[in-house]
């Protein structure tokens, strides 16, 4: 019986015909039109995930992004990257995969992204299954935004040494790629190690959902080129114009790394309600902008989305 069961999985990984929504996720690098996504820290006092997801899709946004913090320790060895006190929503944010599963159930074309998933403090085998499951449930609409994190105390509670987080994250991404793409996967690294095993389902998108690596220039950009399918810098943590200056540097770095710059899309986190600035981003080759929404209710969020919907139409996104 065990041999028969094992033989059931001893097969090629199927490559299905992808839906238009899936193609837009997998082939984002080929899109010339800049997309606009929305992000929120979902809490028990914000709009619900289903409510916001429907509102975004109805208004022409291409994607919903959700962040991750498993908890916030009361000690603080590392400062908040954006400066000042840590906002309350960081303590209260919901689980990203639960949120995206709910959003997937009420939408048809909206892409669904983690922004970002803290892979340095996550088990790669369990996370690989969550990624594959949400990609299946959504019909291939998942975007895997990943990052290594900044909160040293939060990582420590997960058993992650802050000094090792970058190499650990890389190994975990490599291990997850093996799980997604191999019928019988194994991985042997310094921090991640497992013998041949089977893990299903596999993602709808082949070889796997796009891995969009968050992080500043130059180190985050290098990680994106090393194991990612796109780069996602955070505009609020640098001067607005500085991101523009970094785009040609990133493309030069991509070419030096043997990557076609045109096939490594750039998603910028942070945008202003200004058509001229949006056009500048579009003309500079930015693939997507993600706007950060407060953890508010519909009466405050929907008017903001309506203003953005007008800009999206004017932009032609």
Language-model features: locations:
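Extreme N-terminal basic, low-complexity initiation segments
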Residues: 1-11
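Active-site-adjacent structural elements that line small-molecule/cofactor binding pockets in enzymes
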Residues: 6, 14-17, 23-317
């Amino acid at each position: 019986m065990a041999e028969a069961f094992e033989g059931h999985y001893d097969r090629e990984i199927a490559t299905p015909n992808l839906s238009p929504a899936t193609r837009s996720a997998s082939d984002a690098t080929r899109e010339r039109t800049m997309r606009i996504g929305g992000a929120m820290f979902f809490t028990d006092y914000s709009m619900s995930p289903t409510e916001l997801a429907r509102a975004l899709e109805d208004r022409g946004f291409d994607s919903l992004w959700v962040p991750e913090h498993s908890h916030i320790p009361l000690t603080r060895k590392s400062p908040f990257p954006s400066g000042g006190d840590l906002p309350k929503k960081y303590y209260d944010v919901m689980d990203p995969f639960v949120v995206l599963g709910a959003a997937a159930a009420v939408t048809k074309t909206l892409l669904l992204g983690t922004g970002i998933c803290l892979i340095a403090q996550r088990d790669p085998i369990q996370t690989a299954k969550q990624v594959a499951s949400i990609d299946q449930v959504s019909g291939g609409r998942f975007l895997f935004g990943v990052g290594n994190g900044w909160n040293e105390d939060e990582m420590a509670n997960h058993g992650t040494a802050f000094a090792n987080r970058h190499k650990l994250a890389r190994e975990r991404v490599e291990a997850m790629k093996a799980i997604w793409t191999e019928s019988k996967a194994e991985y042997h690294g310094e921090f991640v190690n497992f013998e041949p095993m089977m893990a299903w389902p596999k993602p709808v998108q082949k070889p796997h959902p796009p891995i969009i690596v968050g992080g500043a220039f130059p180190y985050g950009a290098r990680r994106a080129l090393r194991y990612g399918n796109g780069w996602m810098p955070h505009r609020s943590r640098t001067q607005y114009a500085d991101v523009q200056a970094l785009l040609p540097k990133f493309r030069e770095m991509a070419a030096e790394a043997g990557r076609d710059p045109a096939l490594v899309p750039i998603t910028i986190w942070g945008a202003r309600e200004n058509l001229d600035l949006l056009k500048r981003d579009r003309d500079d080759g930015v693939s997507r902008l993600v706007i950060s929404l407060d953890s508010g209710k519909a009466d405050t969020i929907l008017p903001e989305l309506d203003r953005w919907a007008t800009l999206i139409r004017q932009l032609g996104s």
